[in-house]
UniProtKB/Swiss-Prot annotation:
This is ABC transporter C family member 13. Pump for glutathione S-conjugates. The keyword Translocase applies. The keyword Disulfide bond does not apply. Ubiquitous. It is found in: Membrane. GO terms for biological process: transmembrane transport. The chain crosses the membrane at residues 23-43, 60-80, 88-108, 122-142, 148-168, 391-411, 474-494, 505-525, 844-864, 889-909, 963-985, 990-1009, 1087-1107, 1111-1131. It comes from Arabidopsis thaliana (Mouse-ear cress). It is a multi-pass membrane protein. GO terms for cellular component: membrane. Keywords: ATP-binding, Membrane, Nucleotide-binding, Repeat, Translocase, Transmembrane, Transmembrane helix, Transport.
C-alpha cells in the first residue's frame, strides 16, 4: 500500500518538541519495516518464480513503492526548504521512509518469490504496519480537530484500502527450487502442507479477511451447497490428531497414578497454552474498546474481534472433535460390565449435550476475567467523570454479586437433575425406536409415549426452574445500567455538581458499555456451571476400566495346545465392587484344546451366553483367570448388523478376498439370497438389519465371522433362527466344513445334531460347569434334555442333496419387511432456500399467541422506557445548562426514578414471559413429535435409521429447549434497540436518517448474500451431524462384537470420517459468519467516521444540518455510536436465529410423516373376539411398492380354538402373516376377517390390544418386571406368579428379587431364552382368544420347549394359536399347518394327513429332519 508521508510533513512542520514522541514513532515504524524486509529477503532468497509477471503486477509490485519513495523524497526536500532552522531530527521520518521504499523495490526484484502480489509477506506486513501507524497519528489529530489533516490522512488510508481489495485472478505457478532434497524433513513436510492449505484457500490477505470463503458464498447464493463444496480443514484441526493429543494427556494422568484423572486437566494439557495465548489478544481487544478516537477504536477492534473469534472457534472445533472422539473410543474399549453403570441414553447425552457444554467452556473461561476487566475499566472512567458519585451505582453491582451466586447454586442443582432426566428420556426414546414394531403389536405404543411424556414433564420441571432463575439473572443485570445511571447522576447532582452534556453523555456511553458485560455475566456463570458438571460426568465415564484379553499359561499344556484356559473363574455383570457377591459365572474351570468343536448346553438361564461373554472379557472377573490364545470371532445370540451394504457387513473392515468371500457365502447359505437382492451384495441393509428376516440376519452375522478367518469362534445359538434344512447345511459346510474345521469353535446351542457332532460338551447349570467331556461319555443322569431323539439325522444320504435342491428355491420372502434386501434406507431430507415463515408461525403457535404478543409488547415498552429515560436526561441537561430550569433537582430525579421503575417492571415481564414461552414451546414440540412418530407406520422406521430420529430428540430438541430462546431473545433486544435509536434520531434530526439509507442498502445486500449460504451451511451441519449419532448408536449396540473382532481402529476410522465432515461444515459456517462480521464492522466504522465529521462541521454553524441543543447533540452522538453495531448485531442475530430455526424445521419434517389409520368405522366390544375365527381372503401384501409382494393371493381359514403351525424356509414370508394380521403393513388387495369383522374397518389399537403375540425378538424395557409383564395393571399378583410358573421362569424371577425387581436396559438382567419365556408369560396374561407365537421357543432347549408346548396346550384351550416355527417337532401335533414358499401358500392341512402323502411338501420336510 502506497501510504505516502505527505500528511506527516504537515504534522511535523507545525509541531514543537513535545511531539518528539510522534516523530520517533514514525521513524521507528520505518526502521522496523526495513529490518523485517532484510530478514525476509534473506530467508526467501532461494525461492524464485519461473514465469513473467503481468503488466498490472509489475505496476503494483514496483511502481507503488517507487511512488512512495518519490513522495518521501519530495517530503524531505520540502521539509528542509521550509524548516531550515528546525531540528534535524524532523527529517528522520521521510528519510527513513525513502530508504525503506528503496529496500522494498530491491527485495521485490531480487528476493521475493511472490507470483501473486497479495502473497508477498513484505508488502502485506508493510500495508498493515503503515495503516496502524497512520491510525495512531489520526488518533492524535482527532483530539486537535484539525479537519484538513484528518481528510489528508483518510485519503491516504482509503488509497491503501483500495489497493488491498483489488484481486488478480490467476493460478498459482509451481515453485521450482534450485535443489530438490532426496528426503524432506518434518519441517519441510509441515511447510508443504501449510502451503497446500494456503493455496487451497487463498492468499495471506484472504486468510486475514476470510476472503477464501467468497467462492462458497457466491455458490451458495445461487444454488444449493453440497458437501464437496465445503472448506478443507487445516492440518492442525484433523480430528484424529486432536483425539490422539487429548488421549495422550489423559493416559499421562493415569500413568502418573492420579487417583481420579480429570478431563479438565487433560484439556488444559492439550489446549491450555494456545487458549491462554488468546487471552492476550482478548486483553488488547477489550482495552481498545475504551480507547479513542472512535474511528481507530472500531477499525482495530474489527480485526481483533474477528481474529480472536476465528482462533477461538478453531480451538473449540478441535476440542469438540477431541471430546467426541475420546468418548467414542471409550465406548469401544470399555467392556459391557464396566459400562453397566451408564445407560445408553446417558452415554448418548455425553456425545450430544455434554460435549457441546464442555466446548462452551472456551467462551466462558475468558469471559470470567474479561467481563470484570471491562467493568473495572468502565468504572474507572466513570470516576474520572463524576468522581465518587459512581460508588452509589457500584454499590448496587456489589449487592447483586451474592444474589447472583445464590442463583447460580440453584441453577447448578437444577441443571444436574435436568441432565439426569434428559439421559433417562433419551434412553427411553431409544428403547421406543428400537422396539417400535413390538410395541405396536402389543398396542402399547400410546402407553409408552405417555410414559415418555411423563419423563419429559419431570425434565421440563427442572428446565423451568433453570429458565426462571435465568430470568431473574437477566432482570437483575439488565436493570443494573438504568439503576446505575439513576443513582450516579442523582448522587452527583445532590453533591452540588451541575450536569453538563459532556459529563452526562460520556457517562451514558460508559453505562452502555457496561450493559454487555453485565448482561453476559449470568450466562457466563451458567455456562461455567454447565461445563464443569458435564466435565465431571464425562470424566467419570472415561475413568471406566478398559477391556483387555491376554494369554499366559504355566501348566502341562503349552500355548500351542490350548485355545482356552479358565481357572476357577467367577464373573459378574456388575461394575460395582460392592456387588461382587452377585455372580453370574461361579468357579468355572475349563480347558479347550485348539481346533476342537465345543458345544455349550444347558437349560434356559443356566449361564451359556454369560460364559461366552466371560471368555470375551465382557464380564468383570472377580476371581480366577480367563485366558485365550489367538484371535477371536464372535456371533451373538441377537445378530448385530451395520447400516450399510451386504459386503461391508461381511468384510467388517477386512480386505476383499474374492475366493474366500464367495466360499463364505456358499457355506452360510447366503449365495442365493444375495443373488436375489436388488443390487446383489451392494444392496443396503437397513438399520439393525430390519429389512432382513431373522434367519438372514443370523446368517450374515455368521458369514462375517467365517470370513474373518480368526483362530477361535464363539457362536451363541446361531442355528436357532434358521430352519432344519438350512441349519444342516450351515453345520456341514460352515461349522464342520473346510473353512472352520481346523479352528476352535465354542458354540452355545440347543441343536441336537450340533451337539452330537461336538468334540467336547460343556453342560452349564446356574452359572457353573456341571459337566464337561465328549458326547459318548455324557451320563444320562445329568439331564433328560439332551437324550431326546435327533430332530434330523446327518447320516441321511440324501439330505445334503436335498439341501442343494431346496437352495435353488427363491428365498425372497421376508419375515418382517421385504423380500429382498433392497436399498430402502432413505437419505435424510434437506430443505432448500430460506427458512419458511410457516416455521416461525408454528413456533409461535407452540409458544402460544398470547405469550408471543406479551413478549413483543413488553420488549417495545421496555425499550421505550429506556429511551424516555435518556431523553429526560437530555432535557434536564439543557434546562440546567441554560440556567432557566423551573424545577428542582429532586423533581428531575423523581421523574428519572419513575422511568427506572417502569423499565425494571417491563424487563421482569419480558424475561419471565420469554422463559414461559420457551418452555411451553419445548413441551409442545416434544409431545407433538412423539405423537406423530407413535402413529407413523412401521415402514417409516424401517427406512429411517433410529440414530437419525434420535438426533431430533437430542441435539435438535436441545436447541429448541435452550439455544433458540436465547438467540431469539437477543434478536428481539437488537430489533427494539435499533427501533428505539431510529425513533430518537428521528426526533433529534430527521435529515440525519437520509445518511443511513445508502449504508442500509449495503448492509441489506451483504445480509441477503450471506443468509442464503448460512442457511445451506446450517442444514449441511444438521445433515452431517446425523451420521455421527447414527454411527454412535450403532456402535453402542455392537460394541462387544467390535471388540471381539478387534476392529476398534476400523470403527474409529469410520467415526473420524463422519466427524471430519461434520467439522468441515462447522468450520465453513464459522468462516462465513466471520466474513460477514468483519465487513459489517468495517462498514460501520465508515458510518461512525461520517457521523463524527458531520457533528464537528455542524457545530461550527457553517453546515446546513444543525443538531439543536447540546443535550440533543450529545444524545444523537451517543445513539449514533451503537447504531452500526446494532445493525450488525441485528443481521447477525437474525441469521443465527434462522440457523437455530433449522432445528424447528427439522422437527416439523417429522410432523408430516404418514400416519396410520388409527380409527375405524366399526367399534369393538370388550369381549371381542369371542370365537377367534381368522380368515384370509386373497391377501396380497408388499412392504415397498417397488418390490415384489411378500404375500401373494393368500387364502386360508383358521377356525376358533384351532392350533395352527406356519412353516417354511427362512424368509418364506411366515412373519408377514402376522404383520398383515396386526396391520403393521397394509394389504394391497384382499381382506382379513376376525370373527367375521374386516380388520381394516376396526380401530387399529383396539384390534392389536385384542390379540396376543410373542415376537421373534423378545422385548423387555428398563423398569420393574411387573410393568414389563402387566404395564396396564390388569392382573393380580397371584395370577402373574401362576403364569410365570407355567412358563418355567418363576425361579429366575425369584432369584432376581421378584416382580418389583428392576429390569436393566434391553432386559440384560435375563438371558435371551428367559426373555422369550417372559414374553410368553406376558402374552398369556392377556387371555386373548387369538395367540400368535413367532419362534418363541427358538432360543430355549428342546426339553423346556416341550414343556412349554404342553403349557400352551393346557392354558390355551379354546384359544386360536398361530405358531411360526422352524422345528418340525413343534408343529407335528398341531391341528393344522400352513406351508409358505416365496410368499405363496403352497400347502395346508392336518399334519397327519400330509404325512401320509409322500409327495407333499410337508413330508419332504419331515424326511429331511429324520
Amino acid at each position: 500500500m502506497a501510504i505516502t508521508l505527505t500528511n506527516f510533513t504537515f504534522l511535523y512542520m507545525d509541531a514543537n518538541l513535545k511531539r518528539l514522541g510522534d516523530i520517533v514513532l514514525g521513524f521507528g515504524a520505518n526502521v522496523v519495516t526495513l529490518l523485517l524486509i532484510l530478514i525476509l529477503t534473506i530467508t526467501r532468497r532461494n525461492g524464485r518464480c519461473n514465469r513473467r509477471k503481468s503488466y498490472i503486477e509489475k505496476c503494483l509490485l514496483y511502481v507503488t513503492p517507487a511512488l512512495g519513495a518519490c513522495l518521501s523524497c519530495v517530503d524531505l526536500v520540502l521539509l528542509v526548504r521550509t524548516n531550515r532552522r528546525r531540528e534535524v531530527i524532523l527529517c528522520f521520518v521521510p528519510l527513513s521512509g525513502f530508504v525503506m521504499w528503496i529496500a522494498v523495490i530491491l527485495s521485490l526484484k531480487f528476493a521475493c518469490c511472490a507470483c501473486h502480489v497479495f502473497t508477498s509477506q513484505i508488502l502485506c506486513f508493510w500495508w498493515i504496519f503503515r495503516f496502524l501507524t497512520d491510525a495512531l497519528h489520526l488518533n492524535m489529530i482527532f483530539t486537535l480537530q484539525r479537519v484538513q489533516e484528518i481528510c489528508l490522512i483518510m485519503l491516504d488510508i482509503a488509497f491503501g484500502i483500495s489497493i488491498n481489495v483489488l484481486r488478480i485472478k490467476q493460478a498459482h505457478p509451481k515453485i521450482i527450487p534450485l535443489e530438490d532434497p532426496l528426503i524432506e524433513d518434518d519441517d519441510d513436510q509441515k511447510r508443504i502442507v501449510r502451503r497446500l492449505f494456503l493455496e487451497k484457500n487463498g492468499s495471506w490477505w484472504d486468510l486475514f479477511t476470510f476472503g477464501y470463503i467468497g467462492s462458497i458464498m457466491k455458490h451458495g447464493s445461487v444454488k444449493q451447497l453440497e458437501l464437496e463444496n465445503l472448506l478443507t480443514l487445516p492440518p492442525e484441526m484433523d480430528p484424529f490428531t486432536c483425539c490422539e493429543n487429548l488421549l495422550r494427556c489423559w493416559q499421562l494422568q493415569e500413568c502418573n497414578n492420579y487417583s481420579t484423572p480429570s478431563l479438565i486437566w487433560s484439556i488444559y494439557g492439550v489446549y491450555g497454552w494456545p487458549y491462554f495465548r488468546l487471552g492476550l489478544l482478548k486483553v488488547f481487544n477489550d482495552c481498545i474498546g475504551f480507547a479513542g478516537p472512535l474511528l481507530l477504536n472500531r477499525l482495530i477492534k474489527s480485526f481483533l474481534d474477528t481474529q480472536y473469534t476465528f482462533r477461538l472457534s478453531k480451538l473449540k472445533l478441535k476440542l469438540r472433535s477431541s471430546i467426541m472422539s475420546v468418548i467414542y473410543r471409550k465406548c469401544l474399549w470399555v467392556n459391557t460390565a464396566n459400562r453397566s453403570g451408564f445407560s445408553e441414553g446417558e452415554i448418548q447425552t455425553f456425545m450430544s449435550v455434554d460435549a457441546d457444554r464442555i466446548v462452551n467452556l472456551c467462551n466462558s473461561l475468558h469471559d470470567l476475567w474479561s467481563l470484570p476487566l471491562q467493568i473495572g475499566i468502565a468504572l474507572y472512567l466513570l470516576y474520572t467523570q463524576v468522581k465518587f458519585a459512581f460508588l452509589s451505582g457500584l454499590a448496587i453491582t456489589i449487592l447483586l454479586i451474592p444474589v447472583n451466586k445464590w442463583i447460580s447454586v440453584l441453577i447448578a442443582s437444577a441443571t444436574e437433575k435436568m441432565m439426569k432426566l434428559k439421559d433417562e428420556r433419551i434412553r427411553k426414546t431409544g428403547e421406543l425406536l428400537t422396539n417400535i414394531r413390538t410395541l405396536k403389536m402389543y398396542g402399547w405404543d400410546n402407553w409408552f409415549a405417555d410414559w415418555l411424556k411423563e419423563t419429559r414433564a419431570t425434565e421440563v420441571t427442572h428446565l423451568a426452574t433453570r429458565k426462571y432463575l435465568d430470568a431473574w439473572c437477566v432482570f437483575f443485570w439488565a436493570t443494573t445500567p438504568t439503576l446505575f445511571s439513576l443513582c450516579t447522576f442523582g448522587l452527583f447532582a445532590l453533591m452540588g455538581h451541575q450536569l453538563d452534556a459532556a459529563t452526562v453523555f460520556t457517562c451514558l456511553a460508559l453505562f452502555n458499555s457496561l450493559i454487555s458485560p453485565l448482561n453476559s455475566f449470568p450466562w457466563v456463570i451458567n455456562g461455567l456451571i454447565d461445563a464443569f458438571i458435564s466435565t465431571r460426568r464425562v470424566s467419570k465415564f472415561l475413568c471406566c476400566l478398559e477391556h483387555s484379553r491376554d494369554f499366559s499359561i504355566d501348566s502341562g499344556f503349552t500355548s500351542e495346545d490350548l485355545a482356552v484356559c479358565v481357572e476357577d473363574a467367577s464373573c459378574t455383570w456388575s461394575s460395582n465392587v460392592e456387588e461382587d457377591y452377585n455372580l453370574t459365572i461361579k468357579q468355572v474351570s475349563l480347558r479347550v484344546p485348539k481346533g476342537s468343536f465345543v458345544a455349550v448346553i444347558g437349560e434356559v438361564g443356566s449361564g451359556k451366553t454369560s460364559l461366552l461373554n466371560s471368555l470375551l472379557g465382557e464380564m468383570r472377573c472377580v476371581h480366577g483367570s480367563i485366558l485365550l490364545n489367538g484371535s477371536v470371532a464372535y456371533v451373538p445370540q441377537v445378530p448385530w448388523l451395520l447400516s450399510g451394504t451386504v459386503r461391508e457387513n461381511i468384510l467388517f473392515g477386512k480386505p476383499f478376498d474374492s475366493k474366500r468371500y464367495f466360499e463364505t457365502l456358499s457355506a452360510c447359505a447366503l449365495d442365493v439370497d444375495i443373488s436375489l437382492m436388488v443390487g446383489g451384495d451392494m444392496a443396503c441393509i437397513g438399520d439393525k438389519g430390519l429389512n432382513l428376516s431373522g434367519g438372514q440376519r443370523a446368517r450374515f452375522a455368521l458369514a462375517r465371522a467365517v470370513y474373518h478367518g480368526s483362530d477361535m469362534y464363539l457362536l451363541d445359538d446361531v442355528l436357532s433362527a434358521v430352519d432344519s434344512q438350512v441349519g444342516c447345511w450351515i453345520l456341514q459346510r460352515a461349522l464342520l466344513g473346510p473353512l472352520l474345521n481346523k479352528k476352535t469353535r465354542v458354540m452355545c446351542t440347543h441343536n441336537i445334531q450340533a451337539i452330537s457332532c461336538a468334540d467336547m460338551i460343556v453342560v452349564m447349570d446356574k452359572g457353573k460347569v456341571n459337566w464337561s467331556g465328549s458326547v459318548t461319555d455324557m451320563p444320562k443322569s445329568i439331564s433328560p434334555t439332551f437324550s431326546l431323539t435327533n430332530e434330523f439325522d446327518m447320516s441321511s444320504p440324501n439330505h445334503l442333496t436335498k439341501r442343494k435342491e431346496t437352495l435353488s428355491i427363491k428365498e425372497d420372502g421376508v419375515d418382517e419387511i421385504s423380500e429382498a434386501a433392497a436399498d430402502i434406507v432413505k437419505l435424510e431430507e434437506r430443505k432448500e432456500g430460506r427458512v419458511e415463515m410457516m416455521v416461525y408461525r408454528n413456533y409461535a403457535v407452540f409458544s402460544g399467541w398470547f405469550i408471543t404478543i406479551v413478549i413483543l409488547v413488553s420488549a417495545v415498552l421496555m425499550q421505550g422506557s429506556r429511551n424516555g429515560n435518556d431523553l429526560w436526561l437530555s432535557y434536564w441537561v439543557d434546562k440546567t445548562g441554560k440556567g432557566v430550569s423551573h424545577y428542582s433537582t429532586s423533581f428531575y430525579l423523581m421523574v428519572l426514578c419513575i422511568f427506572c421503575i417502569i423499565n425494571s417492571i417491563l424487563t421482569l415481564v419480558r424475561a419471565f414471559s420469554f422463559a414461559f414461552g420457551g418452555l411451553k414451546a419445548a413441551v409442545h414440540v416434544h409431545n407433538a413429535l412423539i405423537s406423530k412418530l407413535i402413529n407413523a407406520p412401521t415402514q417409516f422406521f424401517d427406512q429411517t435409521p433410529s440414530g437419525r430420529i434420535l438426533n431430533r430428540f437430542s441435539s435438535d430438541l436441545y436447541t429448541i429447549d435452550d439455544s433458540l430462546p436465547f438467540i431469539l431473545n437477543i434478536l428481539l433486544a437488537n430489533f427494539v434497540g435499533l427501533l428505539g435509536i431510529i425513533v430518537v434520531l428521528s426526533y433529534v434530526q430527521v435529515l440525519f436518517l437520509l445518511l443511513l439509507l445508502p449504508f442500509w442498502y449495503i448492509y441489506s445486500k451483504l445480509q441477503v448474500f450471506y443468509r442464503s449460504t448460512s442457511r445451506e451451511l446450517r442444514r449441511l451441519d444438521s445433515v452431517s451431524r446425523s451420521p455421527i449419532y447414527a454411527s454412535f448408536t450403532e456402535t453402542l449396540d455392537g460394541s462387544s462384537t467390535i471388540r471381539a473382532f478387534k476392529s476398534e481402529e476400523h470403527f474409529v476410522g469410520r467415526f473420524i470420517e463422519h466427524l471430519t465432515l461434520y467439522q468441515r461444515t462447522s468450520y465453513s459456517e464459522i468462516i462465513a459468519s466471520l466474513w460477514l462480521s468483519l465487513r459489517l464492522q468495517l462498514l460501520g466504522s465508515m458510518i461512525v467516521l461520517f457521523v463524527a465529521v458531520m457533528a464537528v462541521l455542524g457545530s461550527g454553524g457553517n453546515f446546513p444540518i444543525s443538531f439543536g441543543t447540546p443535550g440533543l447533540v450529545g444524545l444523537a452522538l451517543s445513539y449514533a455510536a451503537p447504531l452500526v453495531s446494532l445493525l450488525g448485531s441485528l443481521l447477525t442475530s437474525f441469521t443465527e436465529t434462522e440457523k437455530e430455526m433449522v432445528s424447528v424445521e427439522r422437527v416439523l419434517q417429522y410432523m408430516d410423516v404418514p400416519q396410520e389409520e388409527v380409527s375405524g368405522p366399526q367399534s369393538l366390544s370388550d369381549k371381542w373376539p369371542v370365537h377367534g375365527l381368522v380368515e384370509f381372503h386373497n391377501v396380497t401384501m408388499r412392504y415397498i411398492s417397488t418390490l415384489p409382494p411378500a404375500l401373494t393371493q393368500i387364502s386360508f381359514t383358521i377356525q376358533g380354538g384351532m392350533h395352527v403351525g406356519v412353516i417354511g424356509r427362512t424368509g418364506a414370508g411366515k412373519s408377514s402373516i402376522l404383520n398383515a394380521l396386526f396391520r403393521l403393513t397394509p394389504v394391497c388387495s384382499g381382506e382379513i376377517l376376525v370373527d367375521g369383522k374386516n380388520i381394516s374397518h376396526l380401530p387399529i389399537r383396539e384390534l392389536r390390544s385384542c390379540l396376543a403375540v410373542v415376537p421373534q425378538s423378545p422385548f423387555l424395557f428398563q423398569g420393574s418386571l411387573r410393568d414389563n409383564l402387566d404395564p396396564l395393571g390388569l392382573s393380580e399378583d397371584w395370577r402373574i406368579w401362576e403364569i410365570l410358573d407355567k412358563c418355567k421362569v418363576k425361579a429366575a424371577v425369584e432369584s432376581v428379587g421378584g416382580l418389583d425387581s428392576y429390569v436393566k436396559e434391553s432386559g440384560c438382567s435375563f438371558s435371551v431364552g428367559q426373555r422369550q419365556l417372559l414374553c410368553l408369560a406376558r402374552a398369556l396374561l392377556k387371555s386373548s382368544k387369538i395367540l400368535c407365537l413367532d419362534e418363541c421357543t427358538a432360543n430355549i432347549d428342546v426339553h423346556t420347549a416341550s414343556l412349554l408346548h404342553n403349557t400352551i396346550s393346557s392354558e390355551c384351550k379354546g384359544v386360536t394359536v398361530i405358531t411360526i416355527a422352524h422345528r418340525i417337532s413343534t408343529v407335528v401335533d398341531l391341528d393344522s399347518i400352513l406351508i409358505l414358499d416365496r410368499g405363496i401358500l403352497v400347502e395346508q392341512g392336518k399334519p397327519q394327513h400330509l404325512l401320509q402323502d409322500d409327495s407333499s411338501t410337508f413330508s419332504s420336510f419331515v424326511r429331511a429332519s429324520q
